[in-house]
Amino acid sequence: MSKTYHFIGIKGSGMSALALMLHQMGHNVQGSDVDKYYFTQRGLEQAGVTILPFSPNNISEDLEIIAGNAFRPDNNEELAYVIEKGYQFKRYHEFLGDFMRQFTSLGVAGAHGKTSTTGLLAHVLKNITDTSFLIGDGTGRGSANANYFVFEADEYERHFMPYHPEYSIITNIDFDHPDYFTGLEDVFNAFNDYAKQVQKGLFIYGEDPKLHEITSEAPIYYYGFEDSNDFIAKDITRTVNGSDFKVFYNQEEIGQFHVPAYGKHNILNATAVIANLYIMGIDMALVAEHLKTFSGVKRRFTEKIIDDTVIIDDFAHHPTEIIATLDAARQKYPSKEIVAIFQPHTFTRTIALLDEFAHALSQADSVYLAQIYGSAREVDNGEVKVEDLAAKIVKHSDLVTVENVSPLLNHDNAVYVFMGAGDIQLYERSFEELLANLTKNTQ
C-alpha cells in the first residue's frame, strides 16, 4: 500500500534523491523548501513531485514526515508545528537506516569521493541487476523488485550511524566539517564506529596508515596502487579519453578496465567498486563493460563547451578535492591553461584550512576567488575574508563578483574550472552569458 511522504527541505541533495526514489516505488511524495533555485529541483519537477513553500498548512497527521537534518523548531515553522502537535517524524538518516533493511545494501563512505564512487557503483550494478540507489548529487532510483540498494553514507554529525550495510567502501578520511569535528582523531573515531556496523565486507583505501587502524567484525579488503594491498590497480595509462588499468587480487589479474574519467582519484574509486563487486561474485566482464559507459554524476567534473571555451563545474570545496579536480583537468587538457574559479564554503572551514586551500589552488595556473559562502549554521564574525586566502596563493589571483566576471576573459587557450559548494554556479552562469554576448556582438 502506497504512503504519502512529506519532505521538510526537499531540495537538499540527499532528501531530493530519497524523494525521487520513493516516488518511483509508487508512493505519493511532496515536499517543501525555500523559493531559491537549487540544482536538485529539476529532477523533482520533471518527476512531477510537488514543491511547496514552507508552511504549517502543508502538515497533516496522516503524512509520513521526513525532516532534513539542518532543520530545527527554531528555524523551521513546519517542524515547529509537527513537534507542537506531537506528530511523528523521522530525520533523513533515521528513515534511511530503517528503509535499507529490505535490501542487500552497499554503502560508500569517505571524506572525499563519496558521490562519484556511489554513482559509479550504482551505474554498474543497475546495468547488471535490478538496483535501487541514492546518490548525493540529488539522484535516486527506486524499484520495488530490487535486491540491492547502493547509497552514500555521510559522516557529518555522524549521520551514518543508523546504517548497517552488508558492504561498504571507505574512500579516505580527512579533517573536514570543523564546525562539528574537533580534529582528525574525532573524524577517525566516527568512521571506525561506522565500520563496526558493516556486516559482510569493508573495502578501504590501503595507502593511508590511519585507515589501517579501522577495526570491524566484517572482513577488510584494502585497495590502492601499492603491492601491499589486496586489490591493486596496475599498468595504468592516463589519456585524454580517460584511464585504463588492470586490477589484481591476491597477485592474480581479475580484469582489464577503462573508465571515461580523469585523475588518479577516479582510478582509486573504480578499483574500490571493482573490489566490492568481485567479492560479491559479480562477473568482472560485465563490470568492465559497464564501467566504460559511466557518464559521471552531477556537479562532479561536469563539462560544457561554449564557443570553443571549456567550462568545468565541480563541487570541490576542500583542499584535497581541489587538488584532485585540477589533476583531472590537466589529464584531459594537458596543453591548456588551467584557470580556477573558487568560492570558499563556510567561514569555519576557510579558517581551519586556509594554508591548505592556498596550496591546493596554487596547482592551477591562475586563480579567481568569489566571496566566502557562509553556511546557514554559522555567522560571519569577520575572522576571515577571501582576501586573506588570495594573499597566500602563490599563482596569479584576483577577485570576481557575479556582476563582473570579465577578468576571466584575460586568458587564451584556457579551461575554466568553477569549484565550490555554495552558489558558484551563479558565477559560472554569469560567465556563460558574457561569452554568449561576446559571440553575438562579433557576428
UniProtKB/Swiss-Prot annotation:
Gene Ontology molecular functions: ATP binding; UDP-N-acetylmuramate-L-alanine ligase activity
UniProt superkingdom: Bacteria
Gene3D superfamilies: Mur ligase, C-terminal domain, Mur-like, catalytic domain, NAD(P)-binding Rossmann-like Domain
Compartments reported by the entry: Cytoplasm
Keyword set, alphabetical order: ATP-binding, Cell cycle, Cell division, Cell shape, Cell wall biogenesis/degradation, Cytoplasm, Ligase, Nucleotide-binding, Peptidoglycan synthesis
EC numbers on record: 6.3.2.8
Top-rank EC class of the record's enzyme: ligase
Short name of any one Pfam family annotated for the protein: Mur_ligase
Catalytic activity: UDP-N-acetyl-alpha-D-muramate + L-alanine + ATP = UDP-N-acetyl-alpha-D-muramoyl-L-alanine + ADP + phosphate + H(+)
Pathway it works in: Cell wall biogenesis; peptidoglycan biosynthesis
Record: residues binding ATP: 110-116
BP-aspect Gene Ontology terms: cell division; cell wall organization; peptidoglycan biosynthetic process; regulation of cell shape
GO cellular component terms, A-Z: cytoplasm
Described purpose of this protein according to its UniProt entry: Cell wall formation.
UniProt-listed NCBIfam families: murC
Protein name according to UniProt: UDP-N-acetylmuramate--L-alanine ligase
